[in-house]
């Protein structure tokens, strides 16, 4: 037997239509991306989605201009150069590559994902932990935010912090540790 619903429960059920409810596939895709790239804040995903939508919209508007327009040529080249420098498109080839920029493209340029690509971590979860604990630096700066986007030019400067135990362990394993450098 089911108990009788209380007044506030009846009021809440009046707002829900169990016969014609909609399933949003965006939510499932969003959860899949959040889980795959270990995004901790949903706001990061929505920001990446907005940016990718803006890039696609800008590319579409540039494509609508006449083909010989000097503004179109100059702006398209600038857009492709910027997207290539950020690492969102594989080549500077054509403007159609802008249509394939998604939120996942931005997620692939996050620091933990780049750590995984550089084989500095075995799992994405470990890479996120390394970044949050301050074991990783990009250039001279220690980065503790996993949402940090690494450009193509900065990808070469991703290294361990000098005082990191992980760096010490890696150097000992490779038999490259210098006692003079790591006494700090």
Swiss-Prot record:
GO terms for biological process: ribosomal small subunit biogenesis; rRNA processing. InterPro entries: Ribosomal_uS4 (IPR022801), Ribosomal_uS4_N (IPR001912), S4_RNA-bd (IPR002942), S4_RNA-bd_sf (IPR036986). Residues 109-175 form the S4 RNA-binding domain. Keywords: Nucleus, Ribonucleoprotein, Ribosome biogenesis, RNA-binding, rRNA processing. PROSITE patterns: S4 (PS50889). It is found in: Nucleus, Nucleolus. Its main location: nucleus. SUPFAM superfamilies: Alpha-L RNA-binding motif. GO terms for molecular function: rRNA binding; snoRNA binding. GO terms for cellular component: Mpp10 complex; small-subunit processome. Part of the small subunit (SSU) processome, composed of more than 70 proteins and the RNA chaperone small nucleolar RNA (snoRNA) U3. Component of a heterotrimeric complex containing IMP3, IMP4 and MPHOSPH10. Interacts with MPHOSPH10. Belongs to the universal ribosomal protein uS4 family. PANTHER family: 30S 40S RIBOSOMAL PROTEIN (PTHR11831), U3 SMALL NUCLEOLAR RIBONUCLEOPROTEIN PROTEIN IMP3 (PTHR11831:SF1). Component of the 60-80S U3 small nucleolar ribonucleoprotein (U3 snoRNP). Required for the early cleavages during pre-18S ribosomal RNA processing. Part of the small subunit (SSU) processome, first precursor of the small eukaryotic ribosomal subunit. During the assembly of the SSU processome in the nucleolus, many ribosome biogenesis factors, an RNA chaperone and ribosomal proteins associate with the nascent pre-rRNA and work in concert to generate RNA folding, modifications, rearrangements and cleavage as well as targeted degradation of pre-ribosomal RNA by the RNA exosome. This is U3 small nucleolar ribonucleoprotein protein IMP3. The gene is IMP3.
